């Protein structure tokens, strides 16, 4: 028996790694390394390595540096970080600080208008909520139909939306709900 134990201790070929052990560092360690690299300003240096640069690209979104992302957001909103209004497509300030003369009641009334969403964003929100409701067992369909009334856009967009919801309901085995949706789709067309 001692020969066998000595052979295992000496011969590395017989020693196997556990399946969960790997050569790459853990997720937390990679996060700490990425944070350190960002603080030092050496994000894509040779020391950081290719794995770090790939992670950084994934974290910031499609390899867009955070500084460019901030400027794109500023272009979208029309305001810079210091409160100066800007022309879309340029970074030149137009006027002074933007102030508001609305009272609290006016802000409540204009809450929806202050942050307008596009039709696609509204429809995407509705779709997420409807899919969540479909996946829950024992739900009543009235709430889902109320949400579906809020779908915006031309009939072609609404038709595609209903078809995707029908597919999701069929995937979740909601036959009654699929029948109701098909009836609503026929009425809409």
From Swiss-Prot:
Pfam families documented for this protein: INT_SG_DDX_CT_C
Gene Ontology MF, one: identical protein binding
Localization (cell): Nucleus
Keywords: Nucleus
Domain of life the protein comes from: Eukaryota
GO cellular component labels: nucleus
Assigned protein family: Belongs to the CT45 family.
PANTHER family per the UniProt record, alphabetical: DEAD/H BOX POLYPEPTIDE 26/DICE1-RELATED, INTEGRATOR COMPLEX SUBUNIT 6
Protein name: Cancer/testis antigen family 45 member A10
Organism of this sequence: Homo sapiens (Human)
């Amino acid at each position: 028996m001692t020969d066998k134990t000595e052979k295992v201790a000496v011969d590395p070929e017989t020693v196997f790694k556990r399946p969960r052990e790997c050569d790459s560092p853990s997720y937390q360690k990679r996060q700490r390394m990425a944070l350190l690299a960002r603080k030092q300003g050496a994000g894509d240096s040779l020391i950081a390595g290719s794995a770090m640069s790939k992670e950084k690209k994934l974290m910031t979104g499609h390899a867009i540096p955070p500084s460019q992302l901030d400027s794109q957001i500023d272009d979208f909103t029309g305001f810079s970080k210091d409160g100066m209004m800007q022309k879309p497509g340029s970074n030149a300030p137009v006027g002074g600080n933007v102030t508001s003369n609305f009272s609290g009641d006016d802000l409540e009334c204009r809450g929806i208008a202050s942050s307008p969403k596009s039709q696609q964003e509204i429809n995407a929100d509705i779709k997420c909520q409807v899919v969540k409701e479909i996946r829950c067992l024992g739900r009543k369909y009235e709430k889902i139909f109320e949400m579906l009334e809020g779908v915006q856009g031309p009939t072609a967009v609404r038709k595609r939306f209903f078809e995707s919801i029908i597919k999701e309901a069929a995937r979740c085995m909601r036959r009654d709900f699929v029948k109701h949706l098909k009836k609503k789709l026929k009425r809409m067309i």
